[in-house]
Curated annotation (Swiss-Prot):
Keyword Endoplasmic reticulum part of the UniProt annotation: yes
Ranges in the topological domain labelled Cytoplasmic: 1-224
Catalytic residues identified in the record: 87
Name the record gives this protein: Ubiquitin-conjugating enzyme E2 6
Gene field: UBC6
Pfam name, any one: UQ_con
Protein family per UniProt: Belongs to the ubiquitin-conjugating enzyme family.
One cellular component term from this protein's GO annotations in UniProt: endoplasmic reticulum membrane
Biological process per Gene Ontology, one example term: protein monoubiquitination
Transmembrane region(s): 225-245
Predominant location category: endoplasmic reticulum
Keywords: ATP-binding, Endoplasmic reticulum, Membrane, Nucleotide-binding, Transferase, Transmembrane, Transmembrane helix, Ubl conjugation pathway
PROSITE patterns: UBC_2
Length: 246
């Protein structure tokens, strides 16, 4: 049970977090236990965590702020072991270095800074940048469907996550259908058998440029014409030029 001082201090800090949240961080206490806080870190841009959503806990001692909290990260992230106490200068691993003037915001800013670095500690793990990116992409799904505590503490984020995950799924579906329907001849035209600039003979290059301009002119003169047929014509022309050069 929290002391009156801990209760007062954590209540004040929650108000400050709501009014002025740190970048990429939100945090709130468990409604039934003010000593148990939950946080969500959004992966910053230009890091392998970009787009990731990382849920974790801060477990405060009853005599906070005179002793530091235990820090854990629950969402798989590639930087820390899941649901494991982390050895940081502001965690309960180091009560000797703890400063009672530090706050929840200070702790979580420090955690984010350590997360985006490469220093090792008790509770940290080593993974590749690509592995971290893959976990970042999966993190929203994990929090939304695999973490009961996340759903209980952050129901409004769960709703937003579901909407975003549905949007991503539809986007992937649309892209997949587009790739399946694309005319192979049109695709070949876009890939071009040969570039005009690669034609070595100056006279051949001039003739090719003139022929391409004529094709483009004919295409532009037909506003209702088929773009596919235009690309096919260009592809065949460049393919024949390539054969001629061989």
């Amino acid at each position: 049970m929290a002391t009156k001082q801990a209760q007062k201090r954590l209540t004040k800090e929650y108000k400050m977090m709501v009014e002025n949240p740190p970048p990429f961080i939100i945090a709130r206490p468990n409604e039934e236990n003010i000593l148990e806080w939950h946080y969500v870190i959004s992966g910053p841009p230009d890091t392998p965590y970009d787009g990731g959503q990382y849920h974790g806990t801060l477990t405060f001692p009853s005599d906070y702020p005179y002793k530091p909290p235990a820090i854990r990260m629950i969402t798989p992230n590639g930087r820390f072991k899941e649901n494991t106490r982390l050895c940081l200068s502001m965690s309960d691993y180091h009560p000797d270095t703890w400063n009672p003037g530090w706050s929840v915001a200070t702790i979580l800013n420090g955690l984010l800074s350590f997360m985006t670095g490469d220093e090792s500690t008790t509770g940290s793990i080593t993974t590749t940048q690509q592995e971290k990116k893959i976990l970042a992409k999966k993190s929203m799904y994990y929090n939304t469907f695999n973490s009961t505590r996340f759903k209980l503490v952050f129901p409004e984020i769960v709703e937003k996550n579901i909407t975003e995950l549905q949007r991503r799924k539809q986007e992937e579906k649309d892209m997949s259908m587009f790739e399946k329907k694309e005319d192979p001849l049109v695709k070949a035209a876009r890939e071009k058998a040969i570039e005009v600039k690669d034609i070595v003979n100056p006279e051949d290059r001039i003739r090719a440029e003139q022929a391409l301009k004529e094709l483009e002119k004919q295409h532009n003169d037909k506003p209702n014409g088929s773009s596919s047929m235009f690309y096919i014509g260009v592809a065949l022309f460049l393919f024949l030029v390539g054969l001629f050069m061989k």
